[in-house]
From Swiss-Prot:
GO terms for biological process: defense response. Antimicrobial peptide. It comes from the Eukaryota. This is Peptide PGLa-R6. The modification Leucine amide is found at L21. GO terms for cellular component: extracellular region. It comes from Xenopus ruwenzoriensis (Uganda clawed frog). Belongs to the gastrin/cholecystokinin family. Magainin subfamily. Expressed by the skin glands. Keywords: Amidation, Amphibian defense peptide, Antimicrobial, Secreted. It is found in: Secreted.
Amino acid sequence: GMASTAGSVLGKLAKTAIGIL
């Protein structure tokens, strides 16, 4: 649902940020 979708998006953003840093 909404929670899992939000978690997935946050996970992708976190991985992207880590990749950039």
